[in-house]
């Protein structure tokens, strides 16, 4: 988990933001929460519950109200709003920035930013960016590919063939997100997202060949930066004593950050085309999400057949 984000990262990743004052302080100021403050009551002088550690975002309402205050009161208010813990001030809609704010920010070495975006939209964009940056994170040993627009995480013991299978999937037109190590973070209560570490981005390790650059070999369409993990495929070496699911009735899940992700176990055996099997597993999962379950259809047909045979047997016995 990233404990804090530098204001410089915010400015770099959101081109709509421009620095008005305090460029030299961008690397010094840290943001440790995705919550954003709209200082309305503070402009009236009420600071009892002032969230000083949040980004202070001022829109048309706040700027127009501050313009009605006399100079001394406006100066006192902005001096109180500017604290050592305050990461930055942001003014939306390209509105004029009060000189009292600039002076107060300079005293506490706080960057002042501006944007032409509407306040609500800007707040949403910043919150989404910070949610992703500050989200809980962990690494999973596996390969992440996107099959027909659906993120599939392939896991299994070392040497079982995860990378080779992913390479086959890439050749079949699917996309690689990460090989060997997948960095995973929780986007919201029901969504986990996977991406590659920067040092491994677009790279794969194939035993006997070494490191290959997938984007260089197969083109930009063969890779993607990140994707939601919707299905997990667990590759296991074939065990003749194991009882593998042959009908698909027993649905299993794997918990990642308290999010239950469906998991399918695929036994690995010489002669099995794993890429096609995983491709079909992804399509079958998508069909289930759309309301069609082949295993349930089979069970329904079997029940109807048994029922018809029972009725036929009853009729024959009466004769």
Swiss-Prot record:
It catalyses: [HPr protein]-L-serine + ATP = [HPr protein]-O-phospho-L-serine + ADP + H(+); [HPr protein]-O-phospho-L-serine + phosphate + H(+) = [HPr protein]-L-serine + diphosphate. Gene3D superfamilies: HprK N-terminal domain-like, P-loop containing nucleotide triphosphate hydrolases. ATP binds at residues 156-163. Homohexamer. It comes from the Bacteria. The active site is at residues 141, 162, 180, 246. Both phosphorylation and phosphorolysis are carried out by the same active site and suggest a common mechanism for both reactions. This is HPr kinase/phosphorylase. Keywords: ATP-binding, Carbohydrate metabolism, Kinase, Magnesium, Metal-binding, Multifunctional enzyme, Nucleotide-binding, Serine/threonine-protein kinase, Transferase. InterPro entries: HPr(Ser)_kin/Pase, Hpr_kin/Pase_C, Hpr_kin/Pase_Hpr_N, P-loop_NTPase, Ser_kin/Pase_Hpr-like_N_sf. One of its GO terms (molecular function) is phosphorelay sensor kinase activity. One of its GO terms (biological process) is regulation of carbohydrate metabolic process. It comes from Lactobacillus johnsonii (strain CNCM I-12250 / La1 / NCC 533). Belongs to the HPrK/P family. Signal peptide: none annotated. Its cofactor is Mg(2+). The keyword Hydrolase does not apply. Residues 204-213 are annotated as: Important for the catalytic mechanism of both phosphorylation and dephosphorylation. The Walker A ATP-binding motif also binds Pi and PPi. Mg(2+) binds at residues 163, 205. Catalyzes the ATP- as well as the pyrophosphate-dependent phosphorylation of a specific serine residue in HPr, a phosphocarrier protein of the phosphoenolpyruvate-dependent sugar phosphotransferase system (PTS). HprK/P also catalyzes the pyrophosphate-producing, inorganic phosphate-dependent dephosphorylation (phosphorolysis) of seryl-phosphorylated HPr (P-Ser-HPr). The keyword Ubl conjugation does not apply. Its EC number is 2.7.11.-, 2.7.4.-. Transmembrane segments: none annotated. Residues 267-272 are annotated as: Important for the catalytic mechanism of dephosphorylation.
């Amino acid at each position: 988990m990233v404990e804090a984000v530098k204001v410089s990262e915010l400015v770099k990743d959101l081109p709509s933001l421009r620095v008005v004052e305090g460029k030299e302080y961008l690397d010094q100021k840290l943001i440790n929460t995705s919550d954003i403050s709209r200082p309305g009551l503070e402009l009236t002088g009420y600071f009892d519950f002032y969230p000083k550690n949040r980004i202070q975002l001022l829109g048309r309402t706040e700027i127009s109200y501050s313009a009605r205050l006399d100079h001394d009161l406006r100066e006192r208010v902005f001096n109180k709003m500017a604290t050592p813990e305050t990461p930055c001030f942001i003014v939306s809609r390209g509105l004029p920035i009060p000189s009292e704010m600039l002076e107060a920010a300079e005293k506490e070495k706080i960057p002042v930013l501006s944007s032409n975006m509407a306040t609500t939209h800007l707040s949403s964009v910043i919150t989404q960016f910070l949610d992703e940056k500050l989200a809980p994170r962990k690494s999973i040993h596996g390969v992440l590919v996107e099959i027909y627009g659906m993120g599939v995480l392939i896991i299994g013991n070392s040497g079982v063939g995860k990378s080779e299978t992913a390479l086959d999937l890439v050749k079949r037109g699917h996309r690689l997100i990460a090989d060997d190590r997948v960095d995973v973070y929780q986007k919201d209560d029901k969504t986990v997202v996977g991406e590659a570490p920067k040092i491994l981005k677009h790279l794969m390790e194939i035993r006997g060949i070494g490191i290959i650059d997938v984007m260089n070999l197969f083109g930009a369409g063969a890779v993607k930066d990140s994707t939601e993990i919707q299905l997990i495929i667990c590759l296991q070496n074939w065990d003749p004593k194991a009882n593998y699911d042959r009908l698909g009735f027993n649905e299993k899940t794997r918990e990642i950050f308290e999010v239950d992700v469906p998991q399918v176990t695929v036994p690995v055996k010489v002669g099995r085309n794993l890429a096609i099997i995983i491709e079909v597993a992804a399509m079958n999962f998508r069909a289930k999400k759309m309301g069609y379950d082949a295993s349930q259809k089979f069970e329904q047909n079997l029940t109807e057949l048994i029922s018809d045979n029972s009725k036929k047997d009853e009729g024959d016995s009466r004769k």
